[in-house]
Amino acid sequence: RKHEKDFFARKETKYNESFHETAKKVHAHINELNKSLISEDLDGSQAKVLSDLVVQYNTTFQKLVALQLEIGLDAKSGLYGSLRNAVHGIEKLAKEADEYEILFHMLMLRRNEKDFMLRRDPKYMEKFNNNISNFENALATIQPEKLSQMQSSLNKYQADFKLLFAKESELGLD
């Protein structure tokens, strides 16, 4: 349990490896216990049940680790990194075109994203969707040569945020 908590608190894969090693040791101890019970002509069925629970716990934890890896361990990995790259693309294009209204709307979306990441509250998805509409309305005033790039980056950002929301929901929101 300690390695599990450390993995989610520190977001470092070494704790997943430690968890796996500890689970193997526990499983080996359970097998030894089962052999001892059998050698003493005692019922080893509870050791089998315990072994199955350890396997189930390990499997569930590995699924959660895979989910967290997909979400991201830091600002540059997983969906966190993808969101960051997409929004930086929009920011760069908006600055180059002196489109400060676009920057404003981008920052509002970023605010919704960060509020969701910090508070893990589904209400920020609704706020995000409202601000996407505002952003798209502001895009109507953009020069056509910049519009397709911004729209493409916005679509990527929106898709990644929706996927992040889904994955965080699967992981468990507060």
Model-flagged regions — what are they?
Residues 1-59, 63-174:
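Membrane-proximal N-terminal soluble sensing/regulatory segments of transmembrane proteins
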